[in-house]
Amino acid sequence: MNKQVNLILILLISVFSFAQNTDGYTLLFQEEEPLKIKLKYSNKEMNKKTNDSTFIETQLSYEDAGVWKDVDVRLRARGNFRRNTCYWPPVKVKIKKSAAAGTVFEGNKSLKLVLPCMMEPDKNDNIMKEYMAYKLYEQISPYHFNARRVDIDFTEVRGRKEKSHQIKGFLIEDDDIVAKRFEGKVVDRFIHPLAMD
């Protein structure tokens, strides 16, 4: 526990000690405060009915200055291992340009939503460790993905019943935005895990 507290303190000190240049960041990633969002969908449907080209449609609600606003989004489960292993798989969020216009999501057509793997209470701690790794990397490298913490009020649809969950997660910006910011390009390339050092 002491190690976690020390790591959090070091991260907070480094975040507030170094001024970050937010030029090129979308509005969503210019703030450090956790974004409160609400999502409602069937986890079972997400796992079984979505793939690289098939999405489910829903609304993402977010709090902006005390007022809840809605954005139409399309969602799909990501990843093979987590999709088969986790209760909540990571989610790819697609937002139409017209739906994102004038919202905190403007400029973000595609985001990754990282969620805890399991429903156990301490799993929120694990997701926060992963988030801290992203934030630490922002401090030590000029080439990084921006991440924004989210507090999620998730309503899981289970047939005719609904179950509410309070979970923590974070959003990661799309690789196309990162490539544009650093004047690079995204290269889709499969590298077998055994070929890596």
Residue ranges and their predicted role:
Residues 20-197:
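Phosphate/dinucleotide-binding and metal-coordinating scaffold of catalytic cores
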Residues 1-21:
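Bacterial Sec-dependent N-terminal signal peptides
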